[in-house]
Amino acid sequence: LDLPLFIPRIVNNDSNFFNNDKINLLYIGTIPVHIRNPEYFLKLFCELSGDDIALNIIGSCTAPDLLYSFSESDKRIHIGKSVNHKTALSMISSADFLINFGNNNTHMTPCKIFEYMSYGKPIISVSPIKDEPSSRYLEKYPLSLIIKEYENNVADDIEKLKNFVSQAPKLDQSEFDKLNELFYLNKPEAFIKVIKKEVLQ
């Protein structure tokens, strides 16, 4: 068994949260910068061209001045306050791409990646360290781009990000169904099944 957090969900692409004329990238959650620092990704994003793309960062940050300095210099970056879980899930469902700022602690797996994957959306994840804990899950996920910040290949990472966003990869229904098999050990029902088995023995 593994973290029982993968729950496939229904996707709603009609958004009351974002401008539907733009490609919307979303990070949602807390940002304790001593654990996950968004600066590298923000620098990459600012190198993308075009006004048809937006980066939405929703949630609290221990270094708000860092976020606002980027949003002031690049008007495509939007900073929002924390929202409740129901609203967060609706925003995830409405976004085009989901952003994960990886942890610099090998023992802390960001639980949000399972919610991200459960919607079958393309995910862009930044790994500040080689053994960033979410990478082992995202490497199996067919719509993921893992940016290896620790290698500091800025030019290559900009190009990878640009190509990934321009391709806008999507899962068809059969591919989405395969995620149930791929991440079965991360589903609550697998966890419950084992508990029932142990109780009934």
Language-model segments: residues:
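Nucleotide-activated donor-binding/catalytic signature segment of Leloir-type glycosyltransferases, i.e.
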Residues: 53-89
